[in-house]
Amino acid sequence: DEVVNYIVSEIDASKDSLITNWGRDFDIGLDGRITKGAALALKSRVLLYAASPLYNPTNDVNKWKAAAEAANELLSLNLYSLDNSYRDLFLGDRTAKSSETILAIRQSATNDLERKNYPIGTAGGNSGITPSHNLVSAYEYKGTPDPNDIYANRDPRLGYTIVTNNSQWNGRTMEIYAGGADNYNAKNASRTGYYLKKFLNDNLDLVQDEKRLRSWVVFRLAEIYLNYAEAMNEAYGPDANNGYALTAKEAINLVRGRTGVEMPAITTASKEEFREKVKHERRIELAFEEHRYWDLRRWKDATTVLNEPLTGVQATKNGNHFSYQVKEVEKRTFTEKMYFYPIPHSEINKSNGIVKQNPGW
């Protein structure tokens, strides 16, 4: 609590002296510098983590109220809006200039990410990050399931985030099946039957060393809506607004209803059911943005989820159709003591007994 209070006090002391917004014209080189919005986004994330079960074992509701208030403080600035293209939000110069981006780190033109993550059947591709079937199967169906295409009629964010078999990518049809160009049995191919799409520019000619600008999101509006939804639900339930502009349910449905995604609104009534909806929505909306591992830890769900086998699929082409077999790629282990890793003994010795080792180590 002492550390959290210090962080929050530093943010509160400086937030009003920070510029509200640099605007979206970055010709004068001001992009990436801290704004009031960025400071409040950090405050929102810190207080959400502090309210979560790992750090709040007694479930002190006042910590959830503080997290909700912090998210609302940022939302009340009315400076940001959800981007109308989830796919393009993460590409090139758009990331830094998007109306959704609160803080981004910009890079010069590069193709490192494409070179490391393009499918093995693309010249210069090396597979790299290979999404799991655990994640793919979590994307909801938006329409009626198609028995001939397990990826059809899903949450559109699946297609914006992950390359699946028989989809269009790199100017061709993906062949992630036995005997195909992106065959999972090929050297350096994906072990899961999937490739990463999010953040990657399509159709860069790696042979000619073609490059694009890239920016990395640190904070964006969708995260703040989801922070707000989670904290409001825990503090007041899914349908109360506590005098703020939004209920928890309204906040999460703004994210689900964003242009190009337009998933059905959540109508769940109970706090417990809504809690699971928030966890799901963070998994999907924020996929590969370095939230999932820390979310599982702060929720104390890691000992369940991260002990499940990591799975993939093996596809077989049968004429114009495909059959898919789920396979175990590797076993995973997460024990209770791994919620907090060991403090080096040298640091404990320096403290003259003040610092204690974390449990289990």
PLM region descriptions:
Residues 24-39, 87, 244, 267-270:
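A glycine-rich, coil/turn loop motif that links secondary-structure elements
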